[in-house]
Amino acid sequence: MNIEQENITNTTLTNTNNVNDKPKPKRKKTSRACNHCHKAHMTCDPGRPCQRCIQRGLGSTCEDAPRKRKKYLEDVPNSSLMSSHSINSSDHLDSNGVTPMQSTLSLPMPPVQESPFSTSAPTQSQVPAYTPSTVPQRQPSYSPQVASNYSPNHKTYSATLFQHSATSPELMQTVPEYFPELHNQHYQPSANPNQKRRTNFLSTAADLEYSTLSNILQENFGHHTTSNEGTPNSHNFSPALSPHNMPTTDTNAPPPSIQLASNDQRQVTSFNNHTKHSTPSPLNTSQTKLYEDARYPKCDETINQYFLGDTESGKMVVFPDVLTAIENMKNNDPAVYVERNSKSTLSFAMSISHESNSNNGKDGQLFKEPEEIYEKVKKPFSYTPGYHSLIAYLRKRFTKPMLVKMAESMATYRPSFIACTNSLKEHDLIFMEQCFQRTLLTYDNYIKISGTPTIVWRRTGEVAYVGNEFCVLTGWPKEELIGKDKRKFIVELLDDKSVLQYFQVFSRIAFGDFLGATMTECTLLTPNPNVKIRTGCMWTLKRDVFGIPMMIVGNFLPIL
């Protein structure tokens, strides 16, 4: 009898243990805990207030715990950052268990019951979501990348929209049809002049490069003035297109800005073909005629973009010619000028057909391979005739007080040049010239893919290499700058004030600053004496193996 009682007792204890051994349901982890759970290192849930705070009576103060900011977000205001809780709440399923199509767009959606294509009853969700039955078949799929480009607060420089979607007639028609609030908000000009504007580039690399450098130039050189000495009738067209000189005809028109984008011939050609075959929407039919006027340069009506460089007719369209045409449009046809710039910011697309790799050697000979340099360069380059020609040109152009200032700057570095070269033998001088041509051949490969207007000159100021983008920017033909039996100096391309600054900067970095790089502001002259281009210039000084300045690489960007 006792044995039976013990068996019953053991069976009861075993059943009790089995009941207690049932695993409790694990609490789902959330990506972001509340402030109380975060402080106590406890598991939290996505609800606010969370269950733990409700049990402890802390529901009124339960909120997301602040996260440590990344370094790149230190200067971003809190209002511009979207909390993860709002992102998580937008990823829920609707009442029918259907995932909303791209609901993370954060677009202003109209109510479902107002859509003429809706076949389902409206849900009780606060934010209506488009289901596949709600959207017609001809509507293109809106990815988050496309939607972010249409957002007026979007500050990321992206060229994807303008490469693939800006010229699509279906997209231009669908956006105002299904998203009228978004369409009005996107095309409503901003009343805040300090609001950062989006850029319209066809290349992401050029987009980031030009936008960053333009911001630096505006901050550092916004208070500088441009010299017009020497040409009293000259006009600087860069400030004329700045936001401060907008016509007062339309106060709601956004201020235009000029952006210079460089792309290869293949990319621009495909973009032109896509624009050619696309049919403009009915809303833009009346404005299409404004861009077909033969008096003005070729312009892409969808993004207000002018084309520079080689054209189909074989004519080279240069930057000064376009600036002159835009200035004439502003004076003669202000309505057309305002109409073009009210739709989108002014931008430029450059198409360059590069020749084979070659740089001009001495006496106009071409070097395509390094072996040619070592075989053909058998004599040192004589810098003495270059100095004599430079001084003769300066005496012809400048007055005596300005010549005195230039002579003071040259007196600080020319004796050092003479002293350094006196100890060199003829083979050393030949080797110096071979190094110059070899370095120039290497730079030629980089300059052709950078898209930045670039020019290279020797320490005497004699131009040795010109990039195609520089010719498009200034309008100077390459044959006139580095042609055979041609000797052009960099000072011939600068205005009077910039020439003085050039000698001062060069005297400072020739032997004093071995980093050899500086940024300054200068004004470039063009073949048209009435047109000047205010630019920011980045000078990189390259030295030879003897520590003597060998070449200066100048990169120019227009200040807009």
UniProtKB/Swiss-Prot annotation:
UniProt biased composition (Polar residues): 96-106, 115-149, 222-252
Keyword hit for Iron-sulfur: no
Protein name: Transcription activator of gluconeogenesis ERT1
PROSITE patterns recorded: PAS, ZN2_CY6_FUNGAL_1, ZN2_CY6_FUNGAL_2
Domain PAS: 439-513
A GO molecular function held by the record: DNA-binding transcription factor activity, RNA polymerase II-specific
Swiss-Prot/TrEMBL keywords: Activator, DNA-binding, Gluconeogenesis, Metal-binding, Nucleus, Transcription, Transcription regulation, Zinc
Coiled-coil regions listed: none
InterPro entries assigned to the protein according to its UniProt record, in alphabetical order: ERT1_acuK_gluconeogen_tf, PAS, PAS-like_dom_sf, PAS_13, Zn2-C6_fun-type_DNA-bd_sf, Zn2Cys6_DnaBD
